[in-house]
């Protein structure tokens, strides 16, 4: 039985270190050094939490910028069912879905005669991507400017101010966080739209 004692001591010691001490230490350091990120990168309007900048939301009102399509189960941007459609590029169902999305984008943005940015008609692998490309944001800018009764240049400036660049730059193209952009839009526009942008 003598061999059981060191085994039990080691089990208890490792449990205390890896199960209690290490998680508490890393959590404490995270909240101390990166408080917002450790709390979920929450976005707030006043005292109210309106979402997380890490998870996209399903903006449906035409007065708001829309994000990428979401293929999560049950409802768009469902964080409990993260995942893509898993449709191959050769699958006719994917082509049909993209075609329908292109049609909807052209209907929503009738003044835009150029190609629809690809990220507005294709879902991300997670289904929760909170970002869109600058091209996708600029594509929607005329519609937003018209509905919000703002100069187009002001809307474009909001997009530029919301731009996030990859560091270093060769890691990816600049993107825009849709939730942050819509919150900035609300704060700069005197025309309010019916829906709260915080509602998924």
Swiss-Prot record:
Report the membrane topology from the UniProt record: Single-pass membrane protein
Annotated GO CC locations:
plasma membrane
> GO MF annotations for this entry?
ATP binding; P-type potassium transmembrane transporter activity
Q: Name one GO biological process term.
A: potassium ion transmembrane transport
- Pfam families linked to this entry: KdpC
Coarse class of the primary localization is membrane
Annotated localization: Cell inner membrane
Keyword entries, A-Z: ATP-binding, Cell inner membrane, Cell membrane, Ion transport, Membrane, Nucleotide-binding, Potassium, Potassium transport, Transmembrane, Transmembrane helix, Transport
- Read off the InterPro entries from this record: KdpC
Q: Which PANTHER family match?
A: POTASSIUM-TRANSPORTING ATPASE C CHAIN, POTASSIUM-TRANSPORTING ATPASE KDPC SUBUNIT
What the entry lists under NCBIfam families is as follows: kdpC, PRK00315.1
- Outline the subunit composition: The system is composed of three essential subunits: KdpA, KdpB and KdpC.
Q: What protein am I looking at?
A: Potassium-transporting ATPase KdpC subunit
């Amino acid at each position: 039985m003598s061999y059981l004692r060191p085994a039990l001591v080691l089990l208890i010691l490792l449990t205390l270190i890896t199960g209690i001490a290490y998680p508490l230490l890393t959590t404490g350091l995270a909240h101390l050094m990166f408080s917002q990120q450790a709390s979920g990168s929450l976005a707030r309007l006043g005292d109210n939490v309106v979402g997380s900048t890490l998870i996209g939301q399903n903006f449906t009102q035409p007065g708001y910028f829309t994000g990428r399509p979401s293929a999560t189960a049950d409802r768009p941007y469902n964080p409990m069912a993260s995942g893509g459609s898993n449709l191959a590029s050769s699958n006719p169902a994917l082509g049909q879905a993209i075609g329908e999305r292109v049609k909807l984008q052209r209907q929503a943005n009738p003044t835009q005669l150029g190609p629809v940015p690809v990220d507005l008609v294709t879902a991300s692998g997670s289904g929760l991507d909170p970002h869109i490309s600058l091209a996708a944001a600029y594509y929607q800018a005329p519609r937003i400017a018209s509905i919000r009764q703002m100069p187009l240049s002001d809307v474009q400036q909001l997009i530029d101010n919301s731009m996030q660049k990859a560091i270093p730059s060769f890691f990816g193209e600049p993107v825009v966080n849709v939730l942050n952009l819509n919150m900035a839009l609300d704060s700069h526009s005197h025309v309010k739209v019916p829906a709260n942008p915080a509602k998924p």
